[in-house]
């Protein structure tokens, strides 16, 4: 290698590293998708695959018939600033209102997305807010390419011998492979705090138990332990466990810049994180969440004025965000 070639290599190499290090710093807003008086973006679910962010979320729309509909939708980005057109994945049906995607996992030769129904029949704008009925259940959808998705399939997480009617109201699913036993998959979901069931084939499920928790659970698997991220009445909290039986609170309640964010003044919730600390473009945990406001959810900013935001951290304790 000549001196001139070496000089060019070093120069361009340093430029590349610098550009990679600045991905998060190039963002100009803490808001990824901004809600308004007729639209809410809620419940983000995140997959980082081949340097692309796949963002799944609840899209709530007040439509021309003055009814309120919920959908599961998705968008993709390579830089967290430029996002593809939002693509709706589920049908327009208030008796189902598929929503709250939990995450996407790779199983055999396909991708599996978990989500819920949140039935709200005859829901009109004038009725805001209205919460889902007791018929809410858990489902999965399958894909070969992360673009085309199958019809939803019911998850009988209480076991095949428990009828759908007797399963009880359940929302906010999240899937995770066991840290010790490959091929064993867990489903976390909101029922009696957070409940847990496991399977080896996504058809036959065994109920495991439950523990105290908020909603919108997501779980990381690191250093021989599980890191559970959940949402109490306001903010985001974290627990840790090695066995799903004994849980220890970790850190303080995460509320980020809520005091200065009118768009999240009502509530911050639904945090979900991906560990990109080993990726030179990010070197952080990257967390998505939703914020609603300025009203609280009970005051009406539940199916409107809800936005998806972003924050990041080196250690899950100290968080950085744009002002």
Which residues fall in each region the model found?
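Bacterial Sec-dependent N-terminal signal peptides
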Residues: 1-21
């Amino acid at each position: 290698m000549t001196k001139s070639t070496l000089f060019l290599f070093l120069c361009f190499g340093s430029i590349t590293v610098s550009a990679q290090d600045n991905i998060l710093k190039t963002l100009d807003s803490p808001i990824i998708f901004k809600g308004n008086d007729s639209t809410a973006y809620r419940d983000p679910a995140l997959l980082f695959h081949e340097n692309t962010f796949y963002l799944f979320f609840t899209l709530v729309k007040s439509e021309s018939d003055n009814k309120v509909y919920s959908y599961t939708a998705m968008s993709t980005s390579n830089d967290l600033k430029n996002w593809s057109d939002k693509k709706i994945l589920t049908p327009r049906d208030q008796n189902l209102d598929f929503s709250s995607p939990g995450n996407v996992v790779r199983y055999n030769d396909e991708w599996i997305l978990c989500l819920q129904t949140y039935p709200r029949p005859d829901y009109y704008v004038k009725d805001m807010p209205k919460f889902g009925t007791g018929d809410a259940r858990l489902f999965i959808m399958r894909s070969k390419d992360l673009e085309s998705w199958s019809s939803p399939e019911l998850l009988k997480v209480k076991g095949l011998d428990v009828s759908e009617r007797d399963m009880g109201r359940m929302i906010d699913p999240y899937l995770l492979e066991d840290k010790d036993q490959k091929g064993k998959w867990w489903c976390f979901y909101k029922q009696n705090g957070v409940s847990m069931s496991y399977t080896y084939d996504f058809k036959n499920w065994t109920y495991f138990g439950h523990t105290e928790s908020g909603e919108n659970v997501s779980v990381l698997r690191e250093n021989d332990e599980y890191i559970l991220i959940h949402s109490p009445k306001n903010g985001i909290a974290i627990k840790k466990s090695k066995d799903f039986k004994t849980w220890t609170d970790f850190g303080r309640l995460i509320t980020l810049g809520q005091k200065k964010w009118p768009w999240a003044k009502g509530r911050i919730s639904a945090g979900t994180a991906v560990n990109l600390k080993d990726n030179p473009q990010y070197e952080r945990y990257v967390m998505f969440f939703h914020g609603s406001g300025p009203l609280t959810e009970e005051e009406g900013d539940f199916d409107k004025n809800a936005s998806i935001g972003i924050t990041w951290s080196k250690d899950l304790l100290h968080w950085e965000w744009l002002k």
